[in-house]
Amino acid sequence: MMTLAAALVFLGMAAQKPVATTVPGDPMATQCYTLSNGLKVFLSVNHQSPRITAHIAVRTGSRNDPAETTGLAHYLEHLMFKGTQQYGTSNYEAEKPLLDTIEARYERYRVETDPERRRVLYHEIDSISQLAAQYNIPNEYDKLMAGIGGQGTNAYTSTDVTCYTEDIPANEVDRWARIQADRFQNMVIRGFHTELEAVYEEYNIGIAQDQRKIFEALSAKMFPTHPYGTQTTIGTQEHLKNPSITNIKNYFHNYYCPNNVAICMAGDFDPDEVIAILERHFGSWKPNNNLYRPEFAPIKPITAPIDTTVIGQEAEFVALGWRFDAGNSLQIDTMNVVAEMLSNGTAGLIDLNLNQPLKVMGAGAYSDEMTDYSMLLLLGYPNEGQTLEEVRELLLGELAKLRAGNFDDDLLVSVVNNNKLQYLRALDNNRARTSQLVNAFINHVDWAQEVGKLDRMAGMTKNQIVDFANRHLLDNNFVCVYKRMGVDTTEKKIDKPAITPIPTNRDKQSDFVRNILGEQVEPIHPQFVDYSKEMTVGQTNKKLPLLYKHNDLDDLFYLGYQFNFGNTADNRYGTALGYLDYLGTKKMSATEFKQRMYKLACDMSFNVTDNYITIWLSGLSENMPEAMALLEDLAANAQVDEGAYSNMVEAIIKSRNDAKSSQDECFSRLSAYGTYGPRNAYTDIMSAQQLRNTKPAELLALVKGLRDMQHTVVYYGPMTQKELDKCLKKVHKTKKNLAAVPVGTPYMEQTTPQTEILLAPYDAKNIYMMQYHNEGTQWEPEHAAVINLFNEYFGGSMNAIVFQELREARGLAYSAAAYYRQPSELPHPEYAMTYIITQNDKMMDCINEFNNIVGTIPQSETAFALAKESLMKKLASRRVVRTGVLNSYLSAQRLGLDYDINSVIFNALPGLTLDDIVKFEQQSMAGKPYRYLILGDEKELDIESLEKIAPIRRLTLEEIFGY
């Protein structure tokens, strides 16, 4: 018989059981919970594959950084991967006094101004860090996630959010929850000075990106008395070099509490089981009843345009911004609709009036929702000879049309319909679901309000839009930032610190990790694609090859016409198909065509690659026949517009020249040049002279002729095959005897018979570097398992050798990787590559370390077993669904296969040993000649040491770009 005391305990426990709330009409069927400690939980079920996307969102970001240590929220995000009192260490009791000493030294270091004294203090920090490192077991969090089959382990920080992301097998919720509960309650700051250096490398990447500069400058003027404008998420150079562990701890204890956190999950699970697990592991997490969030006085309205300028070496552009209310304001619905009425990529005012007639190089409208305020932004890139001031006036002119109601009556309805289409597509993706949940939580948007957004949009009228624009989007209440080309003299060079590499201790394992990974869970059995069952390979009634898969989940369709030739056969097709974007037909102008397609909520795209041309149509199935007819009419009857062609050519030429100012673009071209040689996908293009001399009618003839060439129809949608045949017969009219497609000469990866260095110029504080080795080895299916396992072990994750040695142990880079690449198509060969972005004066450190670990691969049975287990769990829980089945089939065909290669990999993995991996690496990578591809500022590099490796061949931008 139950005693009174026991009954009271039972009733108390029952009262603690979280109760779900739902919102009628929610397409995601989200179940919302609040635990007794204030922790929010949002669960959305999606049974497509046995995996779960799990995001843990903390309602804090750089907005709440202490003013004297900006960047703190972001580098706390990094430190959350360093372990707890239970893992990441072999002896926390012995480690803690050393960590406390490091903290105290940093408090002295950050206020010290004497350079010599700072050097001595940093040396002390480095020395004590060596003592602490004997207990440190780096990457144990990553090992835990790998061990349970996690993938996509990451995090991000912004103004108002710090979010930790995972994608786990559906059978691993309990172990994931235990790990996270410990992580969020017992985080320990260790490996601090090497991780901080990795953050600084991330800062170096950002300073070469002018879009970051313009956003920061715009925010500074838009929010002059608020942290959105007075500080940045990455932090200042000075603050990053003078951090405070004490401030980080205080920040963590204040904001990382259950009443300031949400767990957002989407995937294959039973909500009742999941909430019970979360209650069990997170329920004892103590709330912060004194949670402090700084508040700031309202910002004064902008009553006159505020102009500012930033300097950088990338292409010029202009940005305009208007300030709006908090992210949970109903005003934001209208702001987002207005942004899409201005620019949606197809039929917005800016799309039709500026982009299509090429009155500017490119322009668009974007919205940015934040917790305290939001923004609507307009961006514009000038044509050759056009000033930024002229672009600004053109953008303001489109706003004037909005205020005057000078837009098509169907535009608002079309925007709403396309939002519904985008929402429907997003339901297919677990990450999209969790991101929506996270954003609502961070911005204090009630879930019922979020669910009702589309209905509220549907209820908007043209008069409301016009009134909104006249109240909020004026020609005197905005900020304007001009991004001009030049040398930014504010960027300072800081020499690398003297860091003694910390030991990786990769064979050590904490009891916590050993116990967690030693547990047995009910396995998920793999399901590989059986193409004979999952899809139909057949013919249309016109004898066209057909790849068909029925969509029984929703009303979306994807229709493609694939031609088995591409740029290698005729490099004019990309330009020809791009030209269609500016043309109309005898029946419709270019503007009318785009408006009609957008109203149908259908998208049309052309994809020209090395060896394939694909014309894609997608959207709502009920509108597919009309969208097909529009596409066919455009391809067959597009009207030549000489002016549009001339403008397009000049825009292409300018965009090519602008690309030379981008660090990312320059490295992409150098990588292609070093891999394929002077003839590659970037350089095998129509020259400026060819573009100018070509008659546009010739290009339209190419497009018109496509329909009469051999091609394959690819379809995923709700139509039956018979219905599709009928539709194709009526609309997609082809000749009885189709012409053969032209044959191209493929761009082939070059072999590397000797070591050499290719150096291309770019003025930046860091280098981009790739090492490339290719013996011309032909790929075989039997190679796939050992290659995939090698990549998992050596260079493919945060738990891999490369990440541990280059970033964790030495702080040499933010981004580093190494892979043995498999081809996507035969007869292309396999090849090896490494990749890193690092500060200029760390170049030789990176090269030497890469050469060390490639020359003699570090061996760890523990790490190998974990890599194998992780890869097998990922493959077992992987499901290929929807259009993925068709894409998987096409990929297999290009490798000469008629089966899912993952089945071969999975079945071979159990028999592979560490010796197999070592042997493979020694045969394929160690001691081989490599081609070093380095993009950087030569005067900042150790050229003397480089020349000891191999002769340097200096390339010009003209050589790697081909023009």
Locate each region found by the language model.
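Short strand-connecting beta-turns/loops that link adjacent beta-strands
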Residues: 46-49, 257, 313-314, 372, ...
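Active/ligand-binding-proximal structured segments within catalytic/core domains
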Residues: 38, 47-96, 320, 330-342, ...
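Bacterial Sec-dependent N-terminal signal peptides
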Residues: 1-17
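Mature N-terminal segment immediately following signal peptide/propeptide cleavage
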Residues: 23-58, 534-550
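Short acidic, Pro/Gly- and aromatic-enriched capping/linker segments at domain boundaries
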Residues: 17-29, 522-534
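His/Glu-based metal-binding/catalytic segments typifying zinc-dependent metallopeptidases
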Residues: 204-207, 220, 290-347, 379, ...
